């Protein structure tokens, strides 16, 4: 087996800790460092017990080391990542950004990962985007010859307890960023995103509804087949991602603006590595980030013949 790409995790919170467990299972990535700013962080303590080198002295400590990582996964804040990104680039370190910073292109693995494998910095968009944009992409490609998807709307419902203060403070940014991704990555000419923080107790797992307007004469079997194919692709890195039922097709109506519509319902159950299974919205972010990192590492190691 070729050598693994070395990895640093910047951030020591819940998402970083869940990401750590996924990276430890990878055949292509070797997590060696976790960087935080709180010496009492549970994430840093767990990482130390698992054999990683840890620090609470921040990114500058990492960059001062003689041995530097091939990849950095950052799960801090947009402000922190925007400041750190130029430093990573100057050091020749590829960055996978789990913050809203969007320094580099947004990546949703089934839709556009291959396009950005050489990018020095990639962004994981939003949890709602990772869960729903693959479906919009699946529908868009199935009707591309008929003019594509004129409008797509996604509704992401997540357990309220899984949404931290950062998510709550940035709901508007979430909807704006996800809506843009529905268009630029999913392929819809116009997109809209809605997020619901579900207060149910016990917490409900993430559930998403995806509405796509389609040409009235579109091949519905082809659309359904495309959706199933993309769902299977997502399941390779998020086993808890699944359709709740078959795609539902509706004829043009006043409510749909005179357009035919396909509606897809999905749910996302987390793997329970560190975060609880109901936090599928967070799990899909760490799983997708791991997938992106593995694909980058595979390409890099193949080019270098397994030598770093």
Curated annotation (Swiss-Prot):
UniProt KW Hydrolase keyword: no
EC number(s) given by UniProt: 1.2.1.10
Catalytic activity annotation: acetaldehyde + NAD(+) + CoA = acetyl-CoA + NADH + H(+)
Molecular functions (GO terms): acetaldehyde dehydrogenase (acetylating) activity; NAD binding
Pfam families in UniProt: AcetDehyd-dimer (PF09290), Semialdhyde_dh (PF01118)
InterPro entries for the chain: Acetaldehyde_dehydrogenase, Acetylaldehyde_DH_C, NAD(P)-bd_dom_sf, Semialdehyde_DH_NAD-bd
GO BP: catabolic process
Record: active site: 127 (acyl-thioester intermediate)
Source superkingdom: Bacteria
Keywords recorded for this protein, A-Z: Aromatic hydrocarbons catabolism, NAD, Oxidoreductase
Cited SUPFAM superfamilies: Glyceraldehyde-3-phosphate dehydrogenase-like, C-terminal domain (SSF55347), NAD(P)-binding Rossmann-fold domains (SSF51735)
Binding site for NAD(+): 12-15, 162-170, 281
HAMAP family per the UniProt record, alphabetical: Ac_ald_DH_ac (MF_01657)
Family the UniProt entry places it in: Belongs to the acetaldehyde dehydrogenase family.
NCBIfam families attached to this UniProt entry: ac_ald_DH_ac, PRK08300.1
Protein name in UniProt: Acetaldehyde dehydrogenase 2
């Amino acid at each position: 087996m070729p050598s693994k790409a070395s990895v640093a995790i910047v951030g020591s919170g819940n998402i970083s800790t869940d990401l750590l467990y996924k990276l430890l299972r990878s055949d292509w990535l070797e997590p060696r460092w976790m960087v935080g700013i709180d010496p009492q962080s549970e994430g840093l303590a767990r990482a130390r017990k698992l054999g990683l080198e840890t620090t609470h002295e921040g990114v500058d400590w990492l960059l001062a080391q003689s041995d530097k990582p091939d990849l950095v996964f950052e799960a801090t804040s947009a402000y922190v990542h925007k400041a750190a990104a130029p430093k990573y680039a100057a050091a020749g370190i590829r960055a996978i950004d789990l913050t809203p910073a969007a320094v580099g292109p947004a990546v949703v693995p089934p839709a556009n990962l291959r396009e950005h494998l050489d990018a020095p910095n990639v962004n994981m968009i939003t949890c709602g985007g990772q869960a729903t944009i693959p479906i919009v992409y699946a529908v868009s490609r199935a009707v591309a010859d008929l003019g594509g998807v004129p409008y797509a709307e996604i509704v992401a419902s997540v357990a309220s307890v899984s949404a931290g203060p950062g998510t709550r403070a940035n709901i508007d940014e979430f909807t704006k960023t996800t809506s843009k991704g529905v268009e630029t990555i999913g392929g819809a000419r116009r997109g809209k995103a809605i997020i619901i923080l579900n207060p149910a107790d016990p917490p409900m797992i993430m559930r998403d509804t995806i509405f796509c307007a389609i040409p009235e004469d579109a091949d519905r079997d082809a659309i359904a087949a495309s959706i199933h194919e993309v769902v299977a692709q997502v399941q390779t890195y998020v086993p808890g991602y699944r359709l709740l039922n078959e795609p539902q097709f509706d004829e043009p109506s006043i409510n749909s603006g005179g357009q035919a519509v396909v509606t897809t319902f999905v749910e996302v159950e987390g793997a329970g590595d560190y975060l609880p299974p109901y936090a599928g919205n967070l799990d899909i972010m760490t799983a997708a980030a791991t997938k992106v990192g593995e694909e980058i590492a595979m390409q890099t190691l193949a080019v270098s013949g397994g030598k770093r």
